[in-house]
């Protein structure tokens, strides 16, 4: 029987199946950070249990960490306690930890692929929504809650009910200036933030196959914003070339065996998806959000929509509420919206290719007066690589702030936040009310749009410069 890639990976990991019960899945890699792990470790301690597979568990500090003055004590007491608790727990339970200042520290969904820990055909979990990022390698990767984190720590398994499958087919070729971020924002605008609910989305088609691994990670990262549990892209030569030689990738004969297995993972000819969606890459242009959820997006050359244009009363009410919060009027040209802060970073767009793309736009230019730009590498390795290429000097010469690795302004859990009423163009993944700080207003954009916006001071693309 023809199977989808998600079905193949799922079946390979079922260790127990009983009628009327969820499947019990084996977990190949467990990623942890300081925010969702403390209660899980405490649960192990109270039950007098050991961590079952420390060798399949890796921890980093990312959500709460400051991105400057990283060797000073963390000012916020809650953040400081969470980081200190992770260090204590990692030492007690034998977990490999990459703390602030470590060369391999960074956002958990950046360092996993970077180290070669993320591989095709794996099951990967983390107490974090954007674990779907790792699906770019053909892994089944999804976020879990704190009680599930403890279950994986104790047993290296997880009881799960099989997901439905959805294919998002993106054919054609992207025009210059249009990126993976624009694809995924267009997908979410088309199917809505609940369109993928209960599904694993497999991204397919010519436009997807032509993307780099880092671009594929951007797309899979935001599957959650489409309501899906996970996102996947079939492994191919691009995947193998990215992984080969990385610290945890198989070596020698084991590499050859791994590649042979990975080649069996793509969806079989004739396999049936529960749902299919189609987009034409030729027709896509830079995309930006105007509202307070990632599905409220339009092409940059469009205008803020009128709530009355929505036939669904729920969507109409959501649009009215969003425009009130964002302080926008229907019919306003997106390019006329002034921006106070530009954030380049996050597990969506904080990798070396993202920094290169933005630096190319900023080279020889200046950040506009009155605009603050934060450039936050997704990991210390990314920061090191950017410095080796001179990208840091380009950012600093343009007037941007060059920071240490971390989640930063993606979420208001660290010192990098918006003030009430401030408006940002952000390469992150969520634009909810208060996401980047209480009263902050967020427009989701690609790195290219972020850089051009920093120069012009209004939402812009490089074509506007």
UniProtKB/Swiss-Prot annotation:
Q: What class of enzyme is it?
A: lyase
What Pfam families does the database record attribute to this sequence? Aconitase (PF00330)
A Gene Ontology biological process noted in the UniProt record is:
L-leucine biosynthetic process
**Top-rank taxon:** Bacteria
Per the UniProt entry, the Enzyme Commission number(s) are: 4.2.1.33
Q: Which residues bind [4Fe-4S] cluster?
A: 347, 407, 410
Per the record, the pathway is: Amino-acid biosynthesis; L-leucine biosynthesis; L-leucine from 3-methyl-2-oxobutanoate: step 2/4
Q: How is the cofactor bound?
A: Binds 1 [4Fe-4S] cluster per subunit.
UniProt keyword terms in alphabetical order: 4Fe-4S, Amino-acid biosynthesis, Branched-chain amino acid biosynthesis, Iron, Iron-sulfur, Leucine biosynthesis, Lyase, Metal-binding
- SUPFAM superfamilies found in the cross-reference section: Aconitase iron-sulfur domain (SSF53732)
Q: Which GO terms describe its molecular function?
A: 3-isopropylmalate dehydratase activity; 4 iron, 4 sulfur cluster binding; metal ion binding
List the residue ranges of the region (Disordered).
Answer: 417-443
Give the protein's cofactors. Answer: [4Fe-4S] cluster
Report quaternary structure and partners. Answer: Heterodimer of LeuC and LeuD.
Family that this chain belongs to: Belongs to the aconitase/IPM isomerase family. LeuC type 1 subfamily.
Name the HAMAP family for this protein: LeuC_type1
State its role.
Catalyzes the isomerization between 2-isopropylmalate and 3-isopropylmalate, via the formation of 2-isopropylmaleate.
UniProt name for this protein: 3-isopropylmalate dehydratase large subunit
List the taxonomic lineage: Bacteria, Bacillati, Actinomycetota, Actinomycetes, Streptosporangiales
């Amino acid at each position: 029987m023809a199977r989808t890639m998600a079905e193949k990976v799922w079946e390979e990991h079922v260790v127990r199946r009983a009628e009327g019960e969820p499947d019990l899945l084996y977990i190949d890699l467990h990623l942890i950070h300081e925010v969702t792990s403390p209660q899980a470790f405490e649960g192990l301690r109270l039950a007098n249990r050991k961590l079952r597979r420390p060798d399949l568990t890796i921890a980093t500090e990312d959500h709460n960490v400051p991105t400057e003055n990283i060797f000073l004590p963390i000012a916020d007491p809650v953040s400081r306690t969470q980081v200190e608790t992770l260090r204590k727990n990692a030492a007690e339970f034998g977990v490999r930890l990459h703390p602030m200042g470590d060369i391999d520290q960074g956002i958990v969904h950046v360092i996993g692929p970077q180290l070669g820990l993320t591989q095709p055909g794996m099951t990967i979990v983390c107490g974090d929504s954007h674990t779907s990022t790792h699906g770019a390698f053909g892994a089944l990767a999804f976020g879990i809650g704190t009680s599930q984190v403890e279950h994986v720590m104790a047993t290296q398994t997880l009881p799960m009910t099989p997901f439905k499958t959805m294919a998002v087919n993106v054919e054609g070729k992207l025009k210059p200036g249009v990126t993976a971020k624009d694809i995924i924002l267009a997908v979410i605008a088309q199917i809505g933030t609940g369109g993928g609910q209960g599904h694993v989305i497999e991204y397919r088609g010519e436009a997807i196959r032509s993307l780099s691994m880092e671009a594929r990670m951007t797309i899979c990262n935001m599957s959650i914003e489409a309501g899906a549990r996970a996102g996947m892209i079939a492994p191919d030569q691009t995947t193998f070339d990215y992984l080969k030689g990385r610290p945890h990738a198989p070596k020698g004969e084991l590499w050859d065996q791994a590649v042979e297995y990975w080649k069996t993972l793509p969806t079989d000819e004739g396999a049936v998806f529960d749902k299919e969606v189609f987009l034409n890459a030729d027709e896509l242009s830079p995309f930006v959000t105007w509202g307070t959820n990632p599905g409220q997006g339009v092409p940059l050359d469009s205008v803020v929509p009128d709530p009355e244009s929505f036939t669904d009363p729920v969507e109409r009410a959501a649009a009215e509420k969003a425009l009130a919060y964002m302080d926008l009027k229907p019919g306003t040209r997106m390019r006329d919206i002034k921006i106070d802060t530009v954030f380049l970073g996050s597990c969506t767009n904080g990798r070396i290719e993202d920094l290169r793309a933005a630096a190319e736009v900023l080279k020889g230019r200046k950040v506009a007066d009155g605009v603050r730009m934060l450039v936050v590498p997704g990991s210390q390795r990314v920061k090191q690589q950017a410095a080796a290429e001179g990208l840091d000097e380009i950012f600093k010469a343009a007037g941007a702030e060059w920071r240490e690795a971390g989640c930063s302004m993606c979420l208001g859990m660290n010192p990098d936040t918006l003030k009430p009423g401030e408006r940002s163009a952000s390469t992150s993944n969520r634009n909810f009310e208060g996401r980047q700080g209480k009263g902050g207003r967020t427009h989701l954009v690609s790195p290219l749009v972020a850089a051009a916006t920093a120069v012009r001071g209004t939402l812009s693309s490089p074509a506007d410069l």
